[in-house]
Amino acid sequence: MNTALAQQIANEGGVEAWMIAQQHKSLLRFLTCGSVDDGKSTLIGRLLHDTRQIYEDQLSSLHNDSKRHGTQGEKLDLALLVDGLQAEREQGITIDVAYRYFSTEKRKFIIADTPGHEQYTRNMATGASTCELAILLIDARKGVLDQTRRHSFISTLLGIKHLVVAINKMDLVDYSEETFTRIREDYLTFAGQLPGNLDIRFVPLSALEGDNVASQSESMPWYSGPTLLEVLETVEIQRVVDAQPMRFPVQYVNRPNLDFRGYAGTLASGRVEVGQRVKVLPSGVESNVARIVTFDGDREEAFAGEAITLVLTDEIDISRGDLLLAADEALPAVQSASVDVVWMAEQPLSPGQSYDIKIAGKKTRSRVDGIRYQVDINNLTQREVENLPLNGIGLVDLTFDEPLVLDRYQQNPVTGGLIFIDRLSNVTVGAGMVHEPVSQATAAPSEFSAFELELNALVRRHFPHWGARDLLGEK
């Protein structure tokens, strides 16, 4: 057993007390990214090692692996703790997104070690999509590179507001304060182009030697700020979804018997309470919350992130993909939107193509109306293109086969994030973040039911020669 873990259990008074204490710790999800060979995997290995998260058999195995695959001579190659794929170990690079878990006395952590190579941008975007903080590694010898800018842009595009710029390999520049200051100023100049109000912090460190990772460095007396671990333990993550209006996407209609009909899902944002008046979209029908059912029994209220089942006072038509929100909120359904897209398929995204999309449990079909621009993620300039290639990022106009209820991704990632699915292979080929839902004059919600709208779309798609009118007034 890990000796540090054994000591923690003893201090808490037993396994059960320790597990209860773990449940009450806050959780921080973060990713490490940067240019190739900046030391991302080594940094994670150092965090695991210095927080005593490595079991004795793992440490013994690491000694053996360091002799066979290591790049640090007689020293432990801590990157081998993370680089699990054989291809990664042989090349000394990270290809897949590797997840690791550790905890300290103050917090629990989930780390995503993402690839640095440009051809693995899609892997990096996947890792960033669930994270709240990004550690951007910069080699002190090289300074701010194009890949550093690219990873910064992708992180902020996916809603990450907290950036920790870790200037690594300070031991190779003699722990120079001048080098640290120059890189810090260069990055801040670039960061002015990034969107949103960002919390940016800088830490000079050496992942290989352990300077300023989990303990203060004696080699950099000029730096009086916190270590990287202290930043991770103390950074305040404001959960945007808590303050947002109620959004409850229905994942499953739960009807175990004739006496119970509930709507199961995870509350995406806001809060809901018994007796609250709610509205179902896109139908627009209203009802009251009769019960909030959870695994631990009935509740009077529920908050964002909790998996619940809602029971309403009225028997109304609700199906998977419908959205429940407060009755007094006006949120129109739209049939088109501009979407920031990260393309993940070999076949480029082109105007005129159709894909299935999935958003908050709702699956429908979409058409690519046009590509406004592709972002050159090395310098953040925009250029006109005819199609969006593999790993390309751009702003795309989409039209949907049926009305959807959308939020901007920066406001609500659950109801603003979508994936593209190839209709033939059923493979996920892209990720989208709603930039702006495009409002248009649509039929009143009560005029047509969801079934009538779907049937109308089906007839127009498969039997165009019938000349059926679009109930929503579109061409």
From Swiss-Prot:
Pathway: Sulfur metabolism; hydrogen sulfide biosynthesis; sulfite from sulfate: step 1/3. GO terms for molecular function: ATP binding; GTP binding; GTPase activity; sulfate adenylyltransferase (ATP) activity. Its EC number is 2.7.7.4. GTP binds at residues 34-41, 113-117, 168-171. It holds the Pfam family GTP-eEF1A_C. InterPro entries: CysN_GTP-bd (IPR041757), CysN_II (IPR044138), CysN_NoDQ_III (IPR044139), G_TR_CS (IPR031157), GTP-eEF1A_C (IPR054696), P-loop_NTPase (IPR027417), Small_GTP-bd (IPR005225), SO4_adenylTrfase_lsu (IPR011779). Residues 25-239 form the tr-type G domain. The keyword tRNA-binding does not apply. PROSITE patterns: G_TR_1 (PS00301), G_TR_2 (PS51722). Keywords: ATP-binding, GTP-binding, Nucleotide-binding, Nucleotidyltransferase, Transferase. GO terms for biological process: hydrogen sulfide biosynthetic process; sulfate assimilation. Residues 206-208 are annotated as: G5. Residues 34-41 are annotated as: G1. It comes from the Bacteria. It is an enzyme of class 2 (transferase). Residues 168-171 are annotated as: G4. Residues 113-116 are annotated as: G3. Residues 92-96 are annotated as: G2. Belongs to the TRAFAC class translation factor GTPase superfamily. Classic translation factor GTPase family. CysN/NodQ subfamily. Heterodimer composed of CysD, the smaller subunit, and CysN. This is Sulfate adenylyltransferase subunit 1. The gene is cysN.
